[in-house]
């Protein structure tokens, strides 16, 4: 049975990755707005994508609140965001703790992809949060490399999306089918 890709996007990166994944796997990519958990029961593999906002995966409750109903499914979660790859280990631990209160079930695989930030497209709430983050990080006495990078990113557009990043996810799903 074919997998399905579900995504919840705010600025477009997650949708773009979701469509790339669906294209490579020969399946559908569907906006999470139009999906109910009952729709997912027909699939063996569910691939869910959401952007990271303050360490929370956008829309992840579709999966986390229904893990009991999806327990027999292979679940792959992908995130999009601006966290540098050399800081992922620390950040991933925080993301998992914030989104999976009881830990990640064995049948859930998580992948992280670089996203984009176009300052003009941000909502006023996100622009305000970016300014506050920059001010907070810039005021630190001994900022980490990640904090320095985040301060730098606050002033510039950046599109780090890269289709090549999905290759491990594709291999993983194809190996499970």
Model-derived regions: residue spans:
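FMN-binding flavodoxin-like domain, especially the glycine-rich phosphate-binding loop
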Residues: 24, 55-177
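N-terminal beta1-alpha1-beta2 submodule of the flavodoxin-like/Rossmannoid cofactor-binding fold
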Residues: 1-72, 167-177
């Amino acid at each position: 049975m074919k997998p399905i890709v579900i995504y919840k996007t705010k600025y477009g990166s997650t949708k773009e990755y979701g469509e790339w994944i669906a294209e490579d796997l020969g399946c559908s990519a569907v906006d999470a707005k139009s999906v109910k958990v009952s729709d997912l029961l027909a699939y063996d593999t569910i691939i869910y994508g959401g952007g990271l906002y303050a360490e929370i995966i956008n829309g992840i409750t579709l999966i986390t609140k229904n893990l009991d109903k999806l327990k027999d499914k292979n679940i792959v979660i992908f995130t999009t965001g601006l966290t540098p790859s050399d800081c992922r280990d620390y950040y991933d631990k925080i993301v998992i703790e914030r989104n999976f209160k009881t830990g990640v079930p064995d049948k859930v695989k998580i992948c992280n992809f670089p996203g984009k930030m176009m300052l003009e497209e941000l909502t006023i709430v996100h622009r305000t949060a970016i300014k506050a983050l920059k001010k907070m990080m810039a005021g630190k006495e001994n900022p980490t490399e990640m904090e320095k990078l985040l301060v730098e990113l606050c002033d510039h557009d950046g599109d780090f999306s890269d289709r090549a990043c999905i290759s491990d996810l594709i291999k993983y799903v194809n190996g499970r089918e």
